[in-house]
């Protein structure tokens, strides 16, 4: 936050139209920050973890390695297992603070992600939508943690531009972001509610 505040202090920065975007651990940071500040006009979260309590018991799909070490020892550095540090897992799981979210967010999470459980992006999206928050979820079938298909990468780039142009520059809401737009699963249009 110190860096964002330092940037906002510059005359050439419109501090009411700043955004945040991140992928993987950066996606987690976006998921966390939108629940703890309204400093950003919009956020983009790629492959985020939003609920460490549900992700803790998972595995890395590609290797079968437990995800527990990640929360105890590496990126999260909680230093305790889920049961002896339950309060720390809740505190570091932004989903429990989503009633406070004011920042619109575009989430991207793919169904072949072997690093971060795909259901984390779904949990984030469903929680925010259930709470009436502005949230969108993009999922690219058979794509992993990072996009490798050029067509999909271009699509994501275009949608990120649409999203940020709307919230940062006042561009019209793109059709794909409108509430009555169906989502597509395997070529079939569906509705969320």
Where are these regions (language model features)?
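Active-site-proximal cap/loop segments of hydrolase catalytic domains
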Residues: 1-193
């Amino acid at each position: 936050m110190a860096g964002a505040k330092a940037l906002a202090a510059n005359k050439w920065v419109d501090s009411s139209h700043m955004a945040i975007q991140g992928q993987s651990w950066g996606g987690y940071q976006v998921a966390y920050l939108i629940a703890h500040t309204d400093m950003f006009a919009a956020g983009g979260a790629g492959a985020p973890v939003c609920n460490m309590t549900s992700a803790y018991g998972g595995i890395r799909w590609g290797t079968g390695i437990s995800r527990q070490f990640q929360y105890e020892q590496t990126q999260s550095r909680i230093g305790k297992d889920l049961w002896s540090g339950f309060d720390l897992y809740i505190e570091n799981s932004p989903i429990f603070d989503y009633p406070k979210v004011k920042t619109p967010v575009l989430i991207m999470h793919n169904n072949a992600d072997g690093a971060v459980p795909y259901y984390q992006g779904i949990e984030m999206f469903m929680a925010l939508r259930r709470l009436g928050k502005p949230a969108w979820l993009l999922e690219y079938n058979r794509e992993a943690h990072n996009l490798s298909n050029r067509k999909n990468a271009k699509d994501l780039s275009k949608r990120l531009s649409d999203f940020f142009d709307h919230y940062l520059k006042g561009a019209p809401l793109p059709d794909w972001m409108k509430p009555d737009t169906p989502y597509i699963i395997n070529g079939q249009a569906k509705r969320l509610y």
